[in-house]
Curated annotation (Swiss-Prot):
May participate in the maintenance of segment identity in the hindbrain and pituitary development, and maturation or maintenance of the overall structure of the nervous system. May function as a regulatory subunit of ion channels. GO terms for biological process: brain development; positive regulation of insulin secretion. One of its GO terms (cellular component) is cytoplasm. Transmembrane segments: none annotated. Signal peptide: none annotated. The keyword Transit peptide does not apply. This is Neuronatin. Keywords: Developmental protein. It comes from Bos taurus. The gene is NNAT. PANTHER family: NEURONATIN (PTHR15285:SF0).
Length: 81
């Protein structure tokens, strides 16, 4: 029962990171449509799409590897910044 709960929690975390990636991509792709409500404040630079992907994929890879280590019973490590 505990294994099922742990697996469900890890899937929820992985789903959250996938949602964040999709949200960032949506905002980066669609933010400059004419009439779109969300825009960057004047004088600021948008985050590069490659930077968003790299950060999100690093976090996702860390979460997946942490899940594997948890299942195998290995020690924890800190998340990448």
């Amino acid at each position: 029962m505990a294994a099922v709960a742990a697996a469900s929690a890890e899937l929820l975390i992985i789903g959250w990171y996938i949602f964040r990636v999709l949200l960032q991509v949506f905002l980066e792709c669609c933010i400059y449509w004419v009439g779109f409500a969300f825009r960057n404040p004047p004088g600021t630079q948008p985050i590069a799409r490659s930077e968003v992907f790299r950060y999100s994929l690093q976090k996702l890879a860390y979460t997946v590897s942490r899940t594997g280590r948890h299942v195998l019973g290995e020690r924890r490590q800190r998340a990448p910044n």
